[in-house]
Structures are given as C-alpha cells and as structure tokens.
Amino acid sequence: MLNSSDILSAAELADSAKARQKGLAFIDGSVPGYALLLGSDTTKALPILESLTRQQIVVFVVEEQLQTNIKESGVSLGWDAGIIPLTMIKALGCIGRVAQTFGNVNEPDDVMRYSRERLRGFTLLIGESTPERLELAQAALMMGCPLLSDNQLPQSVNEWDKSADYRSAIGGVDLHDIVQVGIEERGLQIKFPLPELPIAYSSDFSGQTVPDDSCGSCLTGVELVVTGENITDGRINIIGLDIDTVKGNQSYAMLIEISGREMQPDFEPVLERQIETIFNNADGIMHRGQRAMVTLRIAQKAIDKGLRLRHLGEVLHAQLHNEFGNILSRVQISIFTEMSQIQAIQEKAQSIHEKRDQRLGNLRDEDVDTFYTCNLCQTIAAGHLCIISPEHPGVCGAVDWMDARAAVSIQPVGSNKAVVKEGLLDAQIGQWESINQAARQESGGEITAYSLYSLMEDPGSACGDFECITAMLPLSNGVMVIDHTYEGMTPSGMDWAMLFEMVGAGSPTPGFLGHSKRLMGTHKFISAEGGWRRIVWMNHALREELRPMLEALANKEGVPGFVDMIATEQNCESEEEILLYLEETSHPVLMMEPMM
C-alpha cells in the first residue's frame, strides 16, 4: 500500500506551476476542495463530474479507463477544466506539493496534517469496490479523504483509521446525494454565484422603500428557520399563487430548513435575521420585521420585469451558503401563499419562538461580564445600534443575548460584536464606559451614550423593526405602550405612524423608546424610572397579550391585579381620563416620584 514517503516522492515530481496555481485557489477559498474519482461506469460518473465542477471542486480522475471514457464522451480534461487525469499517487503528490508550498512544511507527518486540515478532499468510488481500489482509497485517507461509494463496502473498511472527526468510509450512498455527503463530511464551504435575476442586486439598494403607489404585491406574515433532516439542498417550493397573480395585500409564510455538520438550533434565529439584509439588497424589494410580523413589499416594476417568488428563494439559498457555509451545507426553502398552509407554519413558528424565548431562564445582566452589539439594521437606520444583554433584547424581539453570542461564534467579525462590561458609570440607568465607547464607534458617532435601563436619560435608539413604542405621559407621571398593530389615536395625541417618525430613524429621543415585547417581561424595562409600575395605558390587544408576563412581575412584587389598573383605548382616550382611572384603581404610579 502507498505510504507517506511515496506521496512525498510524488510531490517532488509534481508540476510546481500547476500546484501553485491550484493551491492558491485552495487557500483563498475560490476552490473549496477536491475529489478523487475511482470507478469505470461513465454513465454514473458524468453527472457526478458536472455536480463537482459546478461547485468549483477540483476532480482528479485516477483510473486510466475512466479517463479515456470521459474524454470520449466529449468532456474536456485538464487543469483548466478542473477535471485532471492523474493516477492516485500523482494526484496525492500534487496535493502534497500544495501543502509543502503554502504550508511551509516538509516532514511527512506535517505534510499529511496540513493536507487533512487545510486541503479538504474526499474519494468517490463509483462501481465495484475491488481490493485495488480500496487500497488506493485507504492511501488517500492519510491525506484526509474519506471514501464514499454507491455500493455497500466490505467489512475490511471497518479497520481503517477512525481517529478523525469524519467517517473514514461510507457505503450505500445514493448517487444523487453522494457529492453532497462528501461536502458535508469534510466541511467544504461552497460559494454559490448569484442566480440570474430580472432585477439588479447590490447592497446599494438596501434601505430603499416601496411606497403604496408603486407596490405590486404586499406580503405580510411569518418567517421561520429550522434545523431540518432529509432535505434537498437548493430545493425551492412555492405553494400557492405567485406574486404576478397576487395583487395588493396577501398573507405569506416562509419556511427555511437548514442542515450541516456544525448547524445547531441556537443558530436558527441568527440566520432568521439575515433574511431582511439579503432581500433588501434587491432592487424593488422592501423587507421589514421578523418572526410573525414580517412585511415584504415588492414593487410592480420588479414584477413586470419577471421577478417571482422562486427568485427570492434562489437568492436566499445562495447568500446563506456564501455567508454561513462554515455551519451549513443544505438549504431548502418553502414559500407559502396558500392560507391553510400558512396557518400551519404560523402555529409551528409560534411554538418554536416561545421555546427560544425561554432559553435565558432567570439569567440576569449581573450574571454575565459580556454584552453584545447588533448593527444588522443599519441598512435602514444608519445611526442605529442595539446593545444586547440577558435582560435587554434587540428592539426587533428576534435577537437576544444567546442569539448574539451564537452569532459571534459563527462570524467573529459580523453584525454582532462582544463588548466586555467595563467602567461602570451609573448602575441605575445602566451605563458603562466600554458600552458607550462601542456605541459611539459602531453608530458613527450618532450615539454618544447608551443607557440600557432608562427612558429619560440616553435611551437606546430604534430602527424600523421594533415591536412596541413606550412614550412618557407627563400629566399622569407614567408611560403608555402601544404595538404596531394598533391603528387608533393614543392619549398623547399621536398614533403609531407619528410616534414611529420620532423613534424609528436611529436617533435616541428621551421620553420615547422603541423596543421589543420581550423587554417588558424583564426587571430592567425602564427600571431607572420605576419599571412596569410606570405603565398607565396600553392598547387593549397588547395589554391582553402581555397580561401573563406583566401579572407575573406584579404578583412577585406584591401588586396583584396590576394589569387591570392599566387603562386602554376602551376606557380612556385622554390623559385627563387616564388620571381619573388611576385614582379609581389606586395605581401604584400615584405614589411614585416625578419622572421629570
């Protein structure tokens, strides 16, 4: 059997220029890896070759008869084509030469180690597993190439080296899936070109709006990312009418199923929040919101040019691979406009999102030494920045402390950054010098100080995806809270649209705060001003939705029946009416110090 000395001898004879050329592509990531192809069945080999080369994987065809058959079928062979006819020892020698050149290693063990860790490959055996082929495949395993075959493999492969974190040999793999399994076993990061689109796609378009008079289709609904099993990479399912048929307002749902060796449930919300950034780079598309409060507005001009829901799925598939190929290897997307299907996704999403929200348990800000920033929404509000702690989730409600921590573990240099709490300035309002410094840097100077716990002094900013607005009501010495679904006027004399203009541009406004619903269930919600005790008015639907959360807080502090002390549009339309209601219910705000 071939050994490491044989491979190094072959490396000395390898074409230096070709090894350097391909080696550079390995190192810069433009070539994700290589495959060693064994077998003689040309009919089976051709679609595999097409799949490998389409994904920029270099193929070494290592059997002479297969080389001849492929050439006779009209397929170009050679270094430029990425399908290279070499014997197994010469192919491994070429990889060894790349390791020597770019890894600056020469000892056999060092060359083998560099090849396994940095030059990732796998062996494909199409056809009969003869002793000679198995011997060649076992030699390739030294370089980090597991064997995959469409046929069952003999028991002898069970004795092969199993010290790596990938399987050494896998038999009985479906030919349609064999390349994907190889990619997953060795963790190759495939770069996908942007699909052909009828519209322009560039970050230059992020932040654009699609007003009513130019909107061809306005979709509202839910988006969900889950870790899936037995999914097909690149499959795009459209269930229901497409946007060329759907006019005006329409419900919609999108289910994105992800799998990969490094994928885990904690990463799901991180990927979920990337949908907005990916879609907003398309000319004529405006995406706002997350979870079950998504709005997707598509301009009529984009529809007229031929844009369809399938294009959105294709863009999402490619960009998720390109941005997060280090954790995922398969992305399957289903888009629904059929109402019966949408309801099923909504129910599934609600259950999953509730479980995600429970992960933090009783973790408090005082229990951790690191907070996180999130600048994901700066494409729609340039100066905006979220500071995320266990008791201070992002204003969108979709990114909490665990999500941000997971995002940093995936992409250390990305939309989220870790900030160590240092230089406490004021514990009551929640200010630290290190947090202020991070806020100044990442907001481009728009935010000079950031209070996590105060409504009145240096409150945080908001973008366009916040769920609620809290605003001071001076006469009642309290605050009102409304959510985006409320269309009526508030006791402040402003409706949601007016309040949105005040808080939704990325600049902090004392006395006004855009935030998530989840924030109201924490002990740190405007705690500098007294917290939940300050709430004197809410729109009725929001009050009832958050009743369990607010009752739990109030009961724990010895204020039973607190939620019914909060006025709504059903009994109070002005601040004067609120004040009378507070006196009738003996609201605790009457005993509190003035906010101003």
Predicted regions and their residues:
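Cysteine-centered metal-binding/redox modules
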Residues: 3-17, 151-596
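Extended, intrinsically disordered, low-complexity regulatory segments of metazoan chromatin-modifying
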Residues: 32-33, 113-126, 148
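Histidine-anchored nucleotide/phosphate-binding helix
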Residues: 42-61, 136-140
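Short internal beta-strands
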Residues: 57-69, 79-86, 148-151
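Short, glycine-rich nucleotide/cofactor-binding loops
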Residues: 33-45
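A short, charged/proline- and glycine-enriched loop
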Residues: 1, 22-35, 54-55, 119-121
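Long, charge-dense
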Residues: 69-104
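Short N-terminal or domain-adjacent regulatory/targeting segments
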Residues: 1-29, 105-106
